[in-house]
Each structure stands twice: as C-alpha cells, then as structure tokens.
Amino acid sequence: MRWLGRGERVVHDSRFLTVSVADVELPGGETVEHHFVRAPGAAIIVVQDERQRILMMYRHRFVSDLWGWELPGGLVDDREDPAVTAAREAEEETGYRPRNVRHLLTYQPMAGMVDSPHHIYLADGADLVGGPTECTEAQETRWMPLDEAAELLRSGRTVTSGTAIGLLAVLGLGGARQQPGGVQEQPGGAQQQGMNESHSGRTVRG
C-alpha cells in the first residue's frame, strides 16, 4: 500500500536541512499531515589494509552526547560524487588517502521521516599523505583489527548507523580485500606508507 503526496510546504530551510509538512493521502482515503526532513546525503568509507585492519576514529557526538568509534565519512557536497566525498573525508579526518575506492551499498537511515541517502564505500588500504586537516573531528585515529571492530558492534561502542552497516557489510564479505582488476584507483594513489603516526597531538595507532 502506497501513501500519496497531495502537496507540501516548507517550514524551515537551511543549507544543512529542510523541514517540510506534506498532505498525505493514506490507502484508506484519509488525508493527514506528515512532517519530514530532507538533508544532504552522506558518504562513509571502510578503509581496510592488507592485515584486515580497519581505519577507525574515536569521537564525540554533540547532539546525542555520546562517545564512540566511527568510520570516516561526512556530508556529500552539492553535485559531488559520493565516492569523492568518502575519499576526501577520510583524508581530511585522518591524513590517509584511500586506495581502490568502490561502492558497497546505499541505504536510508530513517526512511519514514528523513530523506538522506547514506553511501557506504570500501577501500583497499590507504596512503599517509599528511596530518588531518579537520582537527576538531576525532580524539583518536586507529587501525583496528577486524575482530576487534566486530566486538565494537556487539558491545554497543559504535553509535552511528553508517559505521554499524559498513562494518557489518565487510564482515558479511568475510573481510576479504578485492584483488586488482576492475577497480578504479583514486587519483594520487601510491605505495602505502607506515601505519604508526601521530597527528596534531592526536594518536594514530597501528
């Protein structure tokens, strides 16, 4: 059964989100008001190295006042390819440039009230190109063994849907890295550098 939109009006608009009220006709013919949000999409990336470690960030989320481990990611800029967003955000937040970025899946995290497609990508390793340029994002950046990342899910120490779904997708694939062939490497790819670095007073651990 499908709900039918019969018109909508914007009640709040900003560059971050739009809140609207729609007149919706239900399958039985009744018309109701339905509040919903449209927001930019997001791109999240699972960067997995040859030792099956995952690049993770430990950070605080202001709105929920929660600390947790997350995958790199961020909002997709207007007319930006989400794959470019995913690679850019990883580099800005961690100093690592992902290699061999490819799409895993796209989902809606709150489809009943929010239109904001979230795109999950997988990368085969990353090259250290400098320190993070987004120095307010993470308390700590770490290359985490895949089994430890799985334990984060079981223990509730991941607090964002993109991180949970990204890790579950990789775990469902057996943690396998794709072999060369049929994968487009991101511009600037080079030989992988050392994994143990310190950026702007924040720890990057291997």
UniProtKB/Swiss-Prot annotation:
It comes from the Bacteria. One of its GO terms (molecular function) is hydrolase activity. Belongs to the Nudix hydrolase family. Pathway: Antibiotic biosynthesis. Its cofactor is Mg(2+). It catalyses: CMP-5'-(N-acetyl-N-hydroxy-3-aminopropyl)phosphonate + H2O = 3-(N-acetyl-N-hydroxy)aminopropylphosphonate + CMP + H(+). Nucleotide hydrolase involved in the biosynthesis of the phosphonate antibiotic FR-900098, a potent antimalarial agent that acts as an inhibitor of 1-deoxy-D-xylulose 5-phosphate reductoisomerase (DXR), the first enzyme in the nonmevalonate pathway for isoprenoid biosynthesis. Catalyzes the hydrolysis of CMP-5'-(N-acetyl-N-hydroxy-3-aminopropyl)phosphonate (CMP-5'-FR-900098) to produce CMP and the final compound FR-900098. Residues 37-166 form the Nudix hydrolase domain. Pfam families: NUDIX (PF00293). Its EC number is 3.6.1.-. One of its GO terms (cellular component) is cytosol. Residues 177-194 have a biased composition (Low complexity). This is CMP-5'-(N-acetyl-N-hydroxy-3-aminopropyl)phosphonate hydrolase. It is an enzyme of class 3 (hydrolase). Residues 177-206 are annotated as: Disordered. Keywords: Antibiotic biosynthesis, Hydrolase, Magnesium, Metal-binding. GO terms for biological process: antibiotic biosynthetic process; nucleoside phosphate metabolic process; ribose phosphate metabolic process. A motif (Nudix box) lies at residues 74-95.
